[in-house]
Swiss-Prot record:
It comes from Alkaliphilus oremlandii (strain OhILAs) (Clostridium oremlandii (strain OhILAs)). The record marks S362 as: Required for activity. HAMAP family: ATP_synth_alpha_bact. The keyword Transcription regulation does not apply. This is ATP synthase subunit alpha. One of its GO terms (cellular component) is plasma membrane. Keywords: ATP synthesis, ATP-binding, Cell membrane, CF(1), Hydrogen ion transport, Ion transport, Membrane, Nucleotide-binding, Translocase, Transport. InterPro entries: ATP_synth_asu-like_sf, ATP_synth_asu_C, ATP_synth_asu_C_sf, ATP_synth_F1_a_nt-bd_dom, ATP_synth_F1_asu, ATPase_a/bsu_AS, ATPase_F1/V1/A1_a/bsu_N, ATPase_F1/V1/A1_a/bsu_N_sf. One of its GO terms (molecular function) is proton-transporting ATP synthase activity, rotational mechanism. It comes from the Bacteria. PANTHER family: ATP SYNTHASE SUBUNIT ALPHA, MITOCHONDRIAL (PTHR48082:SF2).
Amino acid sequence: MNLRPEEISSIIKEQIKRYENKLEVKDVGTVIQVGDGIARIHGLEKCMAGELLEFPNAVYGMAQNLEEDNVGCVLLGSDATIREGDIVKRTGRIVEVPVGEALLGRVVNALGQPIDGKGPINTDAYREVERVAPGIISRKSVHEPLQTGIKAIDSMIPIGRGQRELIIGDRQTGKTALAIDTIINQKNTDVICIYVAIGQKKSTVAQIKDSLEKAGAMEYTIIVSSTADELAPLQYLAPYAGCAMGEEFMEKGKHVLIIYDDLSKHAVAYRAMSLLLRRPPGREAYPGDVFYLHSRLLERAAKLSDERGGGSLTALPIIETQAGDVSAYIPTNVISITDGQIFLETELFNAGIRPAVNPGISVSRVGGNAQIKAMKKVAGTLRLELAQYRELAAFAQFGSDLDKETQERLSQGERILEILKQPQYDPMPVEKQIMMIYATTKKYLTDIAVEDIRDFESGFLRFMDNEHPEVGKDIVATGSISEETEAKLKEAIESFKKQFKAERE
């Protein structure tokens, strides 16, 4: 085949035109040490704190320690396939999770990947897990109630939208049950719920999902699960991921309730991670920044100003104490960060007082601002009467000859305690709570035997639904008890009481 010189030159010119020189510049590093879910990488000089790094075999890690000659990285997957000398690439991204309506009703892991077998999550929206909390100007004071449906809480330790209320107590005192009841009570309201399980057993998470499905609460709930068998970095990320999902709704003007169950296990996961990264240990071997770990998470709960859409993110963190020791490191930290705490006691739980709330040391620093007027009016004396009852009950053990006034106070206290008991998965609407607390504080139940109080309560609320539904509707509509409504309520209580007593005779 003969080619003329001019043909050769035209072919070469054509080839030169088509030639594309693609240069891809990537900041890469080399693994110098790996083990226990931690990798040390040489290179990556421009790496950011918290940046996502890509290892071979699609394993990702998160940069934590930026040192002079290496980067300490925690792995978000198995380290079994990673070897010394492997190339690590920067992604230029901070860890993100999917957000939006598509997540409702789903169970996801700490990276927002579905783990419920219902297929992929169809959303294009992503948010960084670490965000700066809203500033002072962006916020508004907490003033709307978030009804938990639990009489002891809504009456004495009210929670407002945008508040951070700690649930604290020993193991097996009903902390999770309290949180789940609060989620169930948000049905038919405009509140979206997120339950973050940190270091829990898989069976526990499955049981919670089952309970929420039975109550019809899963349709407005997201479960973020990082179970006990998962890597410490994933347990560390889970609450921030859940918070990012909640912030997406909050910034669209919606109301969100998020439960962190529990932050004790979160701190333990962070301690394990920090010690493996060779960070110096402090009190109880926790790293020095364990306060910041929780404060930067809980500060993201807020009630936004009207200019920012008026949305809210209410946080209910849970802390597990050891033998009721509230003065340990993590409990004191979280108590000082939150706007109040609900303290659950083993003694009360074992005595059959459930929910086992101790009103003496439980407090809501938002207080009456988070209550409707009607509840404020009827429940004002409740805490005082209970405190007097506890004091007198202690003295009454030593002597039997008590004066009439003391006997009356003891009798009233017993009835209040009985009224505040409530079965699990049975939250009560606020108007029914108000009617029942009104009947108790106005001493209509003094001549009803303590063992009959629960029957009286269920019968009375049925009677109000059937015979006087307008009383409840009026309380809900106005948020207060008018003189007319109060007169109707008094009449209804007396009428039902006669009927109840007649049935018992």
